Regions:
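Sec-dependent N-terminal signal peptides
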Residues: 1-8
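C-terminal motif of bacterial Sec signal peptides marking the signal peptidase cleavage site
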Residues: 9-13
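Low-complexity, acidic Ser/Thr/Pro/Gly-rich terminal tails and inter-domain linkers that flank the onset
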Residues: 18-51
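Surface-exposed edge beta-strand/loop patches
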Residues: 25, 30, 110-167
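Beta-strand elements of well-folded, non-transmembrane domains
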Residues: 44, 61-65, 80-84, 125-127, ...
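The feature marks short-to-medium sequence segments in extracytoplasmic or secretory-pathway proteins
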Residues: 49-51, 62-115
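Short, solvent-exposed loop/turn segments enriched in Ser/Thr/Gly
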Residues: 52-57
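Buried hydrophobic-core signal for structured, non-transmembrane domains
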Residues: 58-61, 121
Length: 167
């Protein structure tokens, strides 16, 4: 009996209640987590000449940790998933052209402590009829928030943007 009590006391001593250290500003679409903040600045509908569709989301990231972070890793820590209806969207890698691989650029981008960088990520979509929802979470804690992006009002990027010959 004494051992059970000690175990219970030990467990309760080991798991102090943590206050969530995050905030979400719905108007600014800004999620501030414990080591980083992610803001959705804009989104653009894009389509390749072959008819592949994607949504290009422009993020503003800031690193409040003490370590330099890879931009993409930081983004993936805070952006839990991006969905259309209930379908999870995949990051569109090389959907358009090798010259325009935003995700590779995002992967190479390093964000030093206290630094702010903007990166752009493309998400492959089946159509532009269903809105996008971006779920934020602070590193697997219970904290979460959802940003809704209506694709109806988005600008569409000109197709020539993806033509390798067009400069």
């Amino acid at each position: 009996l004494a051992l059970a009590c000690l175990t219970i006391i030990g467990l309760s001593a080991c798991t102090p209640e943590k206050e969530p250290t995050w905030t979400y500003d719905k108007n600014k679409m800004l999620f501030t987590g414990q080591d980083a903040s992610v803001q959705v600045l804009s989104a653009t509908k894009i389509e390749s000449p072959e008819g592949q569709k994607a949504v290009r989301v422009h993020y503003k990231l800031s690193n409040s940790s003490k370590e330099t972070m890879n931009a993409y890793t930081l983004l993936m820590k805070v952006v839990l998933d991006v969905k259309q209806e209930k379908e999870e969207l995949k990051v569109a890698t090389l959907v358009f052209s090798k010259d325009d691989d935003r995700d590779m650029i995002a992967n190479k981008t390093k964000i030093a402590p206290k630094e702010v960088k903007e990166i752009v990520v493309d998400y492959a979509v089946a159509d532009f009829d269903h809105d996008l929802s971006i779920d934020f979470s602070d590193y697997g804690t219970e904290a979460n928030a959802t940003a809704k992006l209506s694709l109806q009002n988005l600008e569409k990027a000109p197709v020539k943007y993806f033509d390798k010959k067009a400069q």
